[in-house]
């Protein structure tokens, strides 16, 4: 799991082929699943649906995605533009939290970890949404 967490962005960010990574096949597969790709003829929305559904093929990929989202929502307020915040929050509600529910059903042994991730993600997202709403109302 740790190797997947550390390497999950390497293919997208560095153009590395997952098969070239000096790690187990389990990690290679998880990293490959976490590499977002829009296939020829796909819209970005269709690609996202495919991507999030494919993550369920690997416990490591699914858990890493959720851990990464938890980390990213925790640091996004000070670094994302308002438009990026809105988009990221929408993706979190539409794709990430449904993924979390599916992961909980598929990997019940991780339900304690998933509870903490869900609680943290929702708490941070709710706080940011409330802050943005107050900001918009006070314009």
PLM region descriptions:
Residues 1-139:
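Active-site helical microenvironments for divalent-metal-assisted chemistry
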């Amino acid at each position: 799991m740790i190797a997947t967490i550390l390497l999950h962005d390497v293919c997208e960010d560095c153009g590395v082929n997952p098969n070239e990574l000096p790690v187990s096949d389990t990690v290679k597969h998880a990293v490959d699943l976490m590499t977002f790709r829009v296939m020829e003829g796909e819209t970005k929305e269709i690609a996202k649906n495919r991507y999030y559904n494919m993550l369920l093929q690997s416990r490591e990929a699914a858990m890493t995605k959720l851990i990464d989202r938890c980390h990213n929502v925790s640091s996004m307020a000070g670094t994302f533009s308002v438009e990026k915040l809105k988009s990221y929050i929408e993706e979190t509600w539409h794709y990430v939290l449904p993924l979390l529910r599916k992961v909980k059903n598929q990997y019940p042994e991780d339900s304690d970890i998933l509870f903490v991730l869900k609680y943290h993600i929702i708490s941070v997202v709710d706080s940011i949404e409330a802050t943005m709403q107050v900001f918009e109302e006070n314009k």
